[in-house]
Amino acid sequence: MRKFTLLMLLLIVISMSGIAGAAEVKNLNTSKTFTKIQEAIDDPSTTDGNIIIVGPGNYTENILVNKSLTLKSNGSAIINAVSSEKSTITIKANNVWIEGFIIIGGKNGIYMENVTGCTITNNTIQNAFVSGWEYYGGNGICLVNSTNNTITNNIIRNNTWNGINVCESKGNIIKNNTIMYSGGIGIYVWGFNKFEGNNIIENNRIINATYGGIYLFRPSNNKICRNYIANVSSGGGGMSGAICIDVSDYNIVKDNIGVNCDGGLFTDGMIGNEITNNIFKNCKVAVSESTYGPASRNNKIYGNYFINYETAISDPKGELVDNIWNTTEGGNYWSNYTGNNTGDGTGNIPYYYDNKPLVVDLAIEDIAAKPSGIEVRVKNLGKADIKKIDPLTKLKIKISCDNDVYETFIDPLSAGESQIVRWDKIVPEGNHTIKAEIPYSAEGYLIGTNIRDADISNNVFSKMVQGFVQNKTFTITLTNLGKSTITIKYYISIYTNPVNGTKVSYRELTITLKPNETKTIELGKYPFKYAVSGTMIVKNPSRYRIPLNLRIKYEIEGLNPQMREISKYMAPRGEFRYIARYTGKEEGYADVW
């Protein structure tokens, strides 16, 4: 009986554990619960506008959303496709909201066709798979003929083809997504014919794609802004780049960064695009034009930074000539450009099609000696922004004065930006030559960088400066070493010169010192070459002879103090008069008894 009871208790515990761990799907509007997401969607009482909350757990199913619903999870609901022939989630209704899921496998992670107003946010979508090429397969998210949808803050990775595939879809917002390890393209916007896209693609991070970071094929009027793209290979096809614009017109491509890609900017038959303020770094080919399609023309391509490339422009047919590569203010920055500054911050000779390449021109503008030290003003006279070229670089500055040398580093400067370099060396009185320089190599590269200075003639600057008088604190310290209280009358003057200088200060003091008492007289701050003159009178009011034991210390800040000790007897009703002049040097100390 005891064994039977224990067995029953064990079965109850196991049963309760299973109930507690079971996945739960709840319609907040009807309060009904389900074990499958599709059951909750298909329930007759589930209608447009309902909110379905999906609890933590594994859901093995392919889901069809054919109602305007909100499906939400807290990030712990995992949807595994049961069939690889279908997308894990297929959306066939407008105004659907999908949030907080881990979506694995399927023909696509999420497939949307002929829908509008849907939001896909804060999901992880991975491992969509097809065995060969398909127009609408192997994508993390696939939009077909869909408008005004928002795809944001998703992690999309390890998909056979594209991270996000957008086919003949308009007015969509794709932003703040992280897309990694795409077998095809990170974000692919395309159509079978030219179409008005008006999609916004911004602030996405695309890492490791095979055929392109962001690829536009035939859509027009899209905005591609502030995306970061890294590690895009050519997939063996040769037509690839961080950003690819292929028979796609009137797009704005601005403020994007592409690094470590086979190609930076890939173009083919594009018209009227504005491609400005982008950075392409460590790409094998900075700009390449396809040899297959029509020529690209009337595009604005300026204000971009092409850094550390092997080939600047690949254009075998010369089809990129009919584009606007610069304004009157400047063109693009090319790291391999070797021309010099013309005085306006741009190069003196064209670089391929760019007639006004942006250059770096660091210059020492001025040197000043101040009471606090030496100041050197450094300015970037070029129109290239060093912060964009290498935001982590340090620029070496060297300053020398007399026999002292000071070396330091400054942060990169934007175009036209100045910075003050301060050296806390106090320049003494008199004339001194100060030299400041921005070191560079024989080829004109700034030391410690891969940045060429387009005008080294202004990298060195010397200036004769007048030093400053250094004010120091003057003090007199008196100590009564005797056993009697004494009263001292002190007349103190400050002179500009120890011998015959002008008097600049005068004080009369009466000081009483008890036995073993010390008092300090603060005289103020004066140039260290000034002198202190003091006349001290000590009177003996007694009718008896008394001993006088007194220590006097004259001190100028930073110089050796001078001390005198007086030990003598004072006559009855007599006085002792002591006169001294102090300059801070032993030979300048004179006393009279």
From Swiss-Prot:
Keywords: Cell wall, Cell wall biogenesis/degradation, Glycoprotein, S-layer, Secreted, Signal. This is Cell surface glycoprotein. The lineage of its organism: Archaea, Methanobacteriati, Methanobacteriota, Methanomada group, Methanobacteria. Its main location: secreted. GO terms for cellular component: extracellular region; S-layer. Assemble into mono-layered crystalline arrays. Glycosylated. Glycans are attached at residues 29, 58, 66, 74, 114, 122, 145, 148, 158, 176, 208, 231, 326, 336, 340, 431, 471, 500, 516. It is found in: Secreted, Cell wall, S-layer. Residues 1-22 form the signal peptide. It comes from the Archaea. Pfam families: NosD (PF05048). SUPFAM superfamilies: Pectin lyase-like. Transmembrane segments: none annotated. Gene3D superfamilies: Single-stranded right-handed beta-helix, Pectin lyase-like. It comes from Methanothermus sociabilis. GO terms for biological process: cell wall organization. InterPro entries: Carb-bd_sugar_hydrolysis-dom (IPR006633), NosD_dom (IPR007742), Para_beta_helix_rpt-2 (IPR022441), PbH1 (IPR006626), Pectin_lyas_fold (IPR012334), Pectin_lyase_fold/virulence (IPR011050). The keyword Chaperone does not apply.
